[in-house]
Amino acid sequence: MAGQQEKSKRLRERIKLALPVRVLCKESAGHEWIEMSRLLDVTPFGARFTISHPTEVGRLLQLTLAMPRQLRCFDHIEDQYRVWALVRHLTPRQGADGQLRYDIGVAFTGKNPPASFIREPATRYVIDSISAENNLWQLREAEEKETNSSASRSKETRLQMALPVSVEVFDEEGRVSASEQTVTENISRRGASVWTTLKVDRGRFVRLTSTETGLSVLAAVRAARSGPDGIPRLHLEFIDSQWPLEGLD
């Protein structure tokens, strides 16, 4: 028993290994991006690295890397190890070039994504259990109360006000591909509803900036719909910081 525990401990120790890694993210059915990065550390069951594209806890990424064979849980004879990974931790930080970057911690979940991900890439997941077959993490779809701030967001003060903002959409390279000056329908510390003519699918990430103060936050699109008035709206959840409400009411 002691020997098995020691082996399990060794397997889960992080190994500092700066291997190149190709990161694929399907933000929505119609949009994906690829970014090259380097590992900070790795175990057979997860890894850490840094990317410049926004993402969020609960999303799935596909990693491709020349993983040492002794650290693999499958595909031991393939040159490249292609593994799906769940974002467990995300820390935004300012890079030396002034650009925002994200330190990501992921858990490896297997060779293939869940069927629900194929249908809806914006689906968010949580860890459910460990596979007895390969010791990788098994997933289930996250419930509303488990997705970051969803539960507390519903209790947040939501101000019904037309706050002047700009909405920016990113392309596959992370550059701004479209933008629009508009106003909010309502706003809270954790999210907002904005009127916009931009065509942005659920699951995409956008930047929302106050045209009055210059305050800028990254947000995930939770829904895109038209209200009873026929005007299209985006329902946004802020993912990197909160929006201060002081002085707005």
State what each model feature region is:
Residues 1-249:
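Structured alpha-helical
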